[in-house]
């Protein structure tokens, strides 16, 4: 590395928990390669703070879901973005790194780029799945894209956007062979007997929309598979409190709610019922049969449907290029349908063996030592800025 010894300053923004995870991974890699005096600041979550990150605003101020739901938060988000832009232009950091949250970060990245500050974006938006027109915005805003998936650089190259495939940090973190027995011991679950992990989301709006349906599906599954046990991770005390009325309404369920530890809960399971999102990739890396579902408000769903290109929304299916696990979305996500599909995933041993092969191949493809690759790409951008590449 040819960077000078004077203090480097890197501004970063992560807008939600999954971005906090990715940014923390990147910070770890950067701290191994950049001088100890390097300052990292902007907007981040708890994982970033653990790396000494200086967050000037609370990350949850940016965490929204869906077009309609975001309307009430727009004024505050715009205020924060305006203040951040002014701070960047005044302090002129050595680079700005936006981690996911493209609707927020692209505007900041364009302002940085226009001012001669290198702009790096970590996580290519799913332009290959929906809202493909965003690639024009990417070309205007981003100097370098860090891609989680192997097919993304070719798409960006056609638009003239420099990029690096870095793999996914979850593939580095998760072992190729999950320890189901050890996870059950850790959670106090029986070593034998079927266990289903249920993950209805982490936001109030998600729990409100799909939580009752998931709990009704669990009740049906317990009727049809009397020995089954359920495990449900609650990421925060607030989420556990949000789930409690649903738990109280179904006292017959053999349900264990864990404080966080979602990966341990999924590892302990034989099958998973899960809301669409990054957690579905985690489930695939754990080699678990699953059913993917979501419900969003009607108007949000209509907008998403009209701007989509692929017939699937779950990351395991997108990466496989075909339906390898079932998806039940919107009005198709009834308790009966979810119960039937999840029990099929639980009981079908031939399908389980096939999924293990598919997910192992996927795991190996994504296991790239992401923290190192992403950090090295950032260092190259910094070197290029200083004319020493």
Swiss-Prot record:
Q: Name one GO cellular component term.
A: membrane
Identify the InterPro entries for this entry: Glyco_trans_19
Q: Provide a GO biological process annotation.
A: lipid A biosynthetic process
Query: Which leading EC class covers this enzyme?
Result: transferase
Task: From the UniProt record, give the pathway where this protein acts.
Answer: Bacterial outer membrane biogenesis; LPS lipid A biosynthesis
Q: What is its EC number?
A: 2.4.1.182
Molecular function via GO: lipid-A-disaccharide synthase activity; phospholipid binding
Please give the superkingdom of this protein's source.
Answer: Bacteria
**Keywords for this protein:** Glycosyltransferase, Lipid A biosynthesis, Lipid biosynthesis, Lipid metabolism, Transferase
What chemistry does it catalyse, as a reaction equation?
Answer: a lipid X + a UDP-2-N,3-O-bis[(3R)-3-hydroxyacyl]-alpha-D-glucosamine = a lipid A disaccharide + UDP + H(+)
Q: Which Pfam families match?
A: LpxB
Functional note: Condensation of UDP-2,3-diacylglucosamine and 2,3-diacylglucosamine-1-phosphate to form lipid A disaccharide, a precursor of lipid A, a phosphorylated glycolipid that anchors the lipopolysaccharide to the outer membrane of the cell.
Per the similarity annotation, which family is this? Belongs to the LpxB family.
The name on file for this protein is Lipid-A-disaccharide synthase
């Amino acid at each position: 590395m040819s960077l000078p010894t004077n203090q480097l300053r890197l501004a970063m923004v992560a807008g939600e928990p999954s971005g906090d995870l990715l940014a923390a991974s990147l910070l770890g890699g950067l701290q191994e390669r950049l001088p100890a005096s390097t300052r990292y600041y902007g907007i981040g979550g708890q994982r970033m703070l653990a790396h000494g990150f200086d967050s000037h605003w609370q990350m949850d101020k940016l965490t929204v879901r869906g077009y309609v739901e975001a309307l009430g938060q727009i004024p505050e988000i715009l205020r924060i973005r305006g203040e951040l832009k002014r701070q960047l232009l005044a302090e002129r950091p050595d680079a700005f790194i936006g981690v996911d949250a493209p609707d927020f970060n692209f505007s900041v990245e364009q302002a940085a780029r226009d001012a001669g500050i290198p702009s790096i974006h970590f996580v290519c938006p799913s332009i290959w799945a929906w809202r493909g027109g965003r690639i024009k915005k990417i070309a205007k805003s981003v100097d370098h894209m860090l891609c989680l998936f192997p097919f993304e650089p070719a798409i960006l190259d056609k638009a003239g956007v420099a990029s690096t495939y870095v793999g996914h940090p979850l593939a580095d973190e998760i072992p190729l062979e999950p320890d189901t027995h050890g996870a059950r011991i850790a959670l106090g679950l029986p070593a034998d007997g079927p266990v289903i992990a249920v993950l209805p989301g982490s936001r109030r709006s998600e729990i409100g929309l799909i939580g009752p349906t998931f709990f009704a599906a669990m009740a049906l599954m317990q009727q049809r598979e009397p020995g089954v046990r359920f495990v449900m991770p609650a990421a925060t005390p607030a989420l556990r409190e949000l789930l409690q009325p649903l738990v109280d309404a179904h006292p017959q369920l053999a349900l264990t709610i864990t404080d966080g530890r979602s990966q341990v809960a999924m590892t302990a399971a034989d099958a998973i019922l899960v809301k669409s999102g990054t957690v579905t990739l985690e489930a695939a890396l754990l080699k678990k049969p699953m059913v993917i579902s979501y419900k969003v408000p009607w108007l949000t769903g209509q907008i998403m449907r009209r701007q989509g290109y692929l017939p699937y929304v779950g990351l395991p299916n997108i990466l496989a290029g075909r339906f390898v696990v079932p998806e039940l979305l919107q009005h198709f996500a009834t308790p009966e349908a979810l119960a039937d599909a999840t029990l099929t995933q639980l009981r079908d041993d031939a399908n389980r063996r096939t999924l293990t092969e598919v997910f192992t191949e996927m795991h190996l493809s994504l296991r790239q030592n992401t923290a190192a690759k992403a950090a090295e790409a950032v260092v190259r951008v910094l070197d290029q800025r200083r004319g020493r590449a």
